Regions:
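C-terminal catalytic-base region of ester-bond hydrolases, centering on the histidine
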Residues: 141-216
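Serine-dependent carboxylesterase/thioesterase catalytic core
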Residues: 4, 9-15, 19-20, 24, ...
Length: 216
């Protein structure tokens, strides 16, 4: 289906994954008439700042005028890092709406536990350690941003943090997903991994792109 509107959605994957991981999102967005694209980046060996610059350059090259962003986990905080660094001043482009899914915005207990040991730091990679080393950036004024958290406590994160305080999605606590300045915050009964394959999640993302609000 060809896009029915002059709008694109850039989908950004999380740690240890590639653009293939956001394929379900991308297909749903294309079906809804958006020109959806998946952005891939090396999540372990590359710095957060470098990936943020590459994300901005990727979005600026798209032919559509209005650009929305959808990010999962590390991909979600990468989007915020890009916006905070560059404030999205791209000639001929308009920043659309932003949906962060399972973002460890306030840091992550799982990540902090892993970062205490050398092997854990290798597993986390540079970008996550960059994020944990500094306070969360301020979301620029005017950005229409929605957050989706999960409350199904199933995931590998519970191995690194067996005493993870509920509610959480098996990797990220709901409290860690709070973003100051967000327009909307919604918790759904999905795990951290399920977010990438959930029709309910994509329906809510599309509602936010279209109306600037989740459906309740």
């Amino acid at each position: 289906m060809s896009p029915a509107r002059d709008e694109a959605v850039v989908c950004v994957h999380g740690l240890w994954l590639s653009g293939f991981a956001t394929g379900f999102w991308r297909r749903r967005f294309i079906q809804a008439g958006y020109a959806a694209q998946s952005f891939s980046y090396p999540t372990v060996r590359q710095s957060l700042k470098t990936s943020a610059r590459q994300l901005a350059e990727f979005a600026a090259e798209l032919p559509q005028r209005r650009i929305h962003f959808a990010g999962h986990s590390l991909g979600a905080v990468l989007i915020v890092a890009m916006l905070a660094e560059r404030d999205w001043h791209v000639p001929g482009k308009e920043l659309g709406r932003v949906v962060l899914v399972g973002p460890p915005f306030q840091g992550t207990d799982v990540g902090r536990n892993l970062a205490r040991v050398a092997l854990g730091r290798v597993i986390l990679g540079r970008a996550v350690q960059d994020w944990l080393a500094h306070p969360p950036p301020v979301v620029p004024l005017g950005v229409e941003l929605g957050v989706i958290a999960g409350s199904r406590p199933v995931g590998m994160g519970r191995i690194a943090a067996p005493n993870l305080v509920p509610p959480h999605d098996g990797t990220v606590r709901v409290a860690e997903t709070r973003v100051e300045g967000a327009r909307e915050h919604l918790t759904l009964p999905v795990s951290h991994t399920e977010m990438l394959m959930s029709a309910r999640v994509t329906q809510q993302m599309l509602a936010f792109f279209e109306h600037g609000a989740f459906t309740r």
